[in-house]
Design a protein with these regions (language model features):
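Residues within helix-turn-helix
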Residues: 55, 66, 102-105, 115-116
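Terminal helix-turn-helix DNA-binding modules in bacterial transcription factors
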Residues: 75-113, 135-138
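Residues within the DNA-recognition helix of helix-turn-helix
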Residues: 3, 71, 88, 121
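Residues within the alpha-helical elements of helix-turn-helix
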Residues: 60, 109-110, 125
Length: 138
């Protein structure tokens, strides 16, 4: 093994270990992420900023997108993108079951520029279209 390989292995193990040794800090990070995402979807920001991105979330928390994703994967088993999508789909399901908004209105309120993109993501994550979900729930 070359010295570069040894250094790379050491660096990778040190990087991974930081998520274990900083559990309290990372738990606090998860709480901040959850609050930020909830606040984002309960405000006008999706209409102004569009769909929440990992880059935007990381920037608001003064972190790099890669670090945020690695930290969330360590805590939840999901990447930052998967975590955002999970929360977005939960909010969409809430709208579909508690409001009379059309699917297009829900898509726009969540920050999508095109309802088709929302439909595709929703179906990919739930194996049902938003309309099918609404009909199954009612």
């Amino acid at each position: 093994m070359s010295q570069i390989d040894l250094l790379l292995n050491y660096s990778n193990s040190f990087y991974g270990r930081q998520f274990i040794t900083r559990k309290a800090v990372n738990d606090s990070l998860l709480i901040k992420v959850e609050h930020f995402i909830a606040d984002y979807f309960n405000s006008e920001k999706p209409l102004q900023q569009g769909v929440l991105t990992v880059e935007y979330l990381a920037g608001q928390l003064s972190l790099s997108a890669n670090y945020l994703s690695d930290a969330l994967r360590s805590l939840t088993g999901q990447s930052a993108q998967q975590h955002i999508h999970e929360k977005l789909i939960a909010k969409a399901k809430e709208y579909l079951t508690t409001s009379t908004l059309t699917v297009s209105e829900i898509a726009f309120s969540l920050g999508f520029e095109r309802p088709q993109s929302f439909n595709k993501l929703f179906k990919n994550k739930t194996e049902m279209s938003p309309l099918e979900f609404r009909q199954a729930f009612n």
